[in-house]
Amino acid sequence: MKVVAFERSVQGTGASRRLRNAGKTPAIIYGAGAEPKLIELDHNALYHALKKEAFHSSILDIEVAGKVEKALLRDFQLHPFKQLVLHVDFQRVSATEKIHVKVPLHFLNQETAPGVKLGHGIVNHILNDVEVSCLPADLPEFIEVDLGNLEIGQTLHISDLKLPKGVTIVTHGGDENPAVANISVPAGEVSAAAAESAGEGDKPAA
């Protein structure tokens, strides 16, 4: 994904405000052993790019003064109530060094899963993204999660995911195999079943 940027030589609150008033957004590129570079981007193009999933999880080609640098979006600041991007951070990547990036999950075959189609269950997305470790060339835009065989009451875990070659999942918090999604019984049906069971328990013995 290509991003066109321009070098900027001034920084500070006043300079950033003037940039924003001119329809630009201040940004910085850092990392990969090179000096940080101050840049500016067209605000409207950036604002629309931030709405795209791939902008957050892909290697970006940032063109500055005719030179392209490969980088990841690492952070961005939004105005608390205006549709305004205040600042953006990009991190350079090296082709030979592994990166850690959060990648979105795309859930497939939810409607045809046995637990939904036959059991009338509800799909619960426990995770919507996962952190992966890989070389920049191996970074996937997303990871597919196939729910096509999931029965009611079953849970899909990280270990069940089919990962692209060269990609591993990074887990935190001590749980090495967290749940990704499950299919549960609708709350109304659970309540009805519980009430029916309680009613049967209240019947006098014959």
Swiss-Prot record:
UniProt xrefs under InterPro entries: Rbsml_bL25/Gln-tRNA_synth_N, Ribosomal_bL25/Gln-tRNA_synth, Ribosomal_bL25_b-dom, Ribosomal_bL25_C, Ribosomal_bL25_long, Ribosomal_bL25_short, Ribosomal_L25_dom, Ribosomal_uL5_bac-type
GO biological process: translation
Gene: rplY
Entry keyword set: Ribonucleoprotein, Ribosomal protein, RNA-binding, rRNA-binding
Protein family membership: Belongs to the bacterial ribosomal protein bL25 family. CTC subfamily.
Organism: Ralstonia nicotianae (strain ATCC BAA-1114 / GMI1000)
Protein name listed in UniProt: Large ribosomal subunit protein bL25
A Pfam family of this chain: Ribosomal_L25p
SUPFAM superfamilies the UniProt entry points to: Ribosomal protein L25-like
HAMAP family hit by this protein: Ribosomal_bL25, Ribosomal_bL25_CTC
A cellular component annotation (GO) from this entry: cytosolic large ribosomal subunit
Superkingdom as given in the UniProt entry: Bacteria
